């Protein structure tokens, strides 16, 4: 059986991995998953991202903790296969008043809401991370 929403599965694996205090998690890899993971790593929400090559490439994410608590307090899927959410540059949301990050898929690639605002781009809101 095929997976209906691989991005939601990725976010759930991150959420569950941190709830279980896992050091690292792995999942099937895709270009979009790697791009999202790289944005989360650049923002400091996860430690590192590694793609393990093979017949079926695996994405390995090393989770990050601060004083024994997960750095990611909440991670929430916004746009989904059944209901895509697109926003223009002036409509991009601020998560937790600017403390969190919205991951946005734009014509120039996957980036944070802040980077999209600076570049003057809108796009599909993939998820909120705080």
UniProtKB/Swiss-Prot annotation:
BP-aspect Gene Ontology terms: translation
GO MF, any single term: rRNA binding
Keywords: Ribonucleoprotein, Ribosomal protein, RNA-binding, rRNA-binding
Origin: domain of life: Bacteria
Keyword GTP-binding: no
Record-level GO cellular component terms: ribonucleoprotein complex; ribosome
Gene3D superfamilies found in the cross-reference section: 3.30.1370.30, 3.30.1490.10
Oligomer status and interactors: Part of the 30S ribosomal subunit. Contacts proteins S5 and S12.
Family: Belongs to the universal ribosomal protein uS8 family.
Role, per record: One of the primary rRNA binding proteins, it binds directly to 16S rRNA central domain where it helps coordinate assembly of the platform of the 30S subunit.
HAMAP family: Ribosomal_uS8_B (MF_01302_B)
Protein name, as recorded: Small ribosomal subunit protein uS8
Organism: Mannheimia succiniciproducens (strain KCTC 0769BP / MBEL55E)
Gene: rpsH
